[in-house]
């Protein structure tokens, strides 16, 4: 026998999960890789039993291999997510989209004239950024498990949530700075627009990741 049965593949999958590999895409990838190694070993020596082949494959991989792959995959996905985030935000700062970003900034600046205390207005703007954690948290909670499975790519894409609490502290700091130096209103609004673009880009990328996963693994 050179090919593993569905039952044997299920046994290998359970073995992979025993190493605390909880992410579905990694479980599938590592199971496929382990199975292919076992089948290669079996072709070389068809007289071996399933458990003998599995033991030889285990020796090739080592005890730490699976967690090392998980760690490496996290780094790769994080770098790719950061790259996509930078690209998406940069697109908003290129012609013609930058015109909309500039007009939005001008609108925010003009609104500040209607406030007796512009520093309070600026603080409120940064406080509003915190509200973007609501849709991202919703997407994460809703898709934390898709068909009962957890995905590392979804977890990485929702990592932006951890940044939102900082906006509260930033709002207080900005408020004090603008109160002492009103000239900082314009650069502060520019900063706010960029952070706003990061927030909406984060929501867009998270939804995109979830959609791609559902298509790739044919999930609903």
Regions found by a protein language model. Give the residues of each.
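N-terminal, intrinsically disordered, low-complexity segments
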Residues: 1-66
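Cytosolic-side membrane-entry/anchor segment at the start of a transmembrane helix
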Residues: 1-12, 16, 78-85, 139-157
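Intrinsic-disorder-associated interaction segments
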Residues: 5, 31, 46, 74, ...
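Aromatic-enriched hydrophobic runs in primary sequence
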Residues: 19, 23, 27, 31, ...
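Cytosolic juxtamembrane regions of integral membrane proteins
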Residues: 48-107
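Hydrophobic alpha-helical bundles in membrane proteins
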Residues: 86-220
């Amino acid at each position: 026998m050179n090919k593993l049965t569905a039952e044997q593949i299920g046994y290998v999958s359970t073995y992979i999960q025993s190493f605390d590999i909880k992410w579905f895409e990694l479980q599938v990838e590592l199971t496929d890789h382990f199975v292919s190694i076992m089948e290669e070993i079996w072709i070389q020596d068809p007289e071996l039993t399933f458990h003998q082949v599995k033991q030889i494959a285990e020796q090739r991989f080592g005890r730490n291999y699976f967690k090392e792959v998980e760690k490496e995959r996290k780094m790769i996905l994080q770098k790719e997510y950061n790259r996509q985030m930078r690209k998406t935000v940069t697109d908003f700062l290129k012609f013609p989209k930058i015109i909309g970003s500039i007009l939005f900034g001008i609108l925010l600046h003009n609104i500040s004239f209607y406030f007796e205390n512009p520093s309070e207005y600026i603080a409120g703007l940064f406080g509003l950024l915190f509200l973007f954690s609501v849709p991202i948290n919703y997407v994460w909670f809703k898709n934390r498990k898709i068909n009962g499975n957890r995905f590392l790519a979804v977890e990485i894409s929702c990592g932006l949530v951890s940044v939102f609490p900082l906006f509260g502290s930033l709002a207080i700091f900005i408020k004090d700075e603008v109160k002492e130096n009103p000239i900082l209103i314009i650069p502060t609004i520019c900063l706010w627009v960029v952070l706003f673009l990061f927030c909406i880009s984060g929501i867009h990328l998270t939804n995109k990741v979830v959609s791609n996963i559902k298509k790739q693994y044919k999930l609903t």
